[in-house]
Amino acid sequence: MAIVGLGTDIVEIERITAHVARSGDKLAKRVLTEAEFEIYQQHSQPSRYLAKRFAAKEAAAKALGTGIGRGVSFQHIHIGNTPDGAPTIDFTQGAQQRLALLNGVVGHISIADEKSYAIATVILESR
């Protein structure tokens, strides 16, 4: 296997908190899949959760070489967790099509947060 994509993104959590305070769930509904949105609504720190998912999806879009847009939507990238809590990444629709163009078969993701920031890195591997 070879690396065919690498992306990293960092988000200031307070920026997301302020956006949620101004606009309610508008950003969350745009960024999160339906399953992610359900978790967001029940999360003890929803803005932190949203910031981490936002960073993860931006990192994934960078790894795909498109950014968000150009056929890849936030909704085409799903960030989940294993039963042990490790993050997982799944691609659908435009993101899956772009991954196939890269001969990519698997995505690896790391997400971290500290007091003020959330950061994510995505590595895509080919066959």
From Swiss-Prot:
Reactions catalysed according to its record: apo-[ACP] + CoA = holo-[ACP] + adenosine 3',5'-bisphosphate + H(+)
EC number: 2.7.8.7
SUPFAM superfamilies: 4'-phosphopantetheinyl transferase (SSF56214)
Keyword set includes Cytoplasm: yes
Enzyme class (EC, first level): transferase
Stretches of the chain forming a coiled coil according to its record: none
GO terms under biological process: fatty acid biosynthetic process
A GO molecular-function annotation: magnesium ion binding
UniProt keyword annotations, A-Z: Cytoplasm, Fatty acid biosynthesis, Fatty acid metabolism, Lipid biosynthesis, Lipid metabolism, Magnesium, Metal-binding, Transferase
Binding site for Mg(2+): 9, 58
InterPro entries: 4-PPantetheinyl_Trfase_dom, 4-PPantetheinyl_Trfase_dom_sf, ACPS, Ppantetheine-prot_Trfase_dom
HAMAP family the record matches: AcpS (MF_00101)
Sequence similarity: Belongs to the P-Pant transferase superfamily. AcpS family.
Function: Transfers the 4'-phosphopantetheine moiety from coenzyme A to a Ser of acyl-carrier-protein.
Record's protein name: Holo-[acyl-carrier-protein] synthase
Species annotation: Shewanella sp. (strain MR-7)
Species lineage: Bacteria, Pseudomonadati, Pseudomonadota, Gammaproteobacteria, Alteromonadales
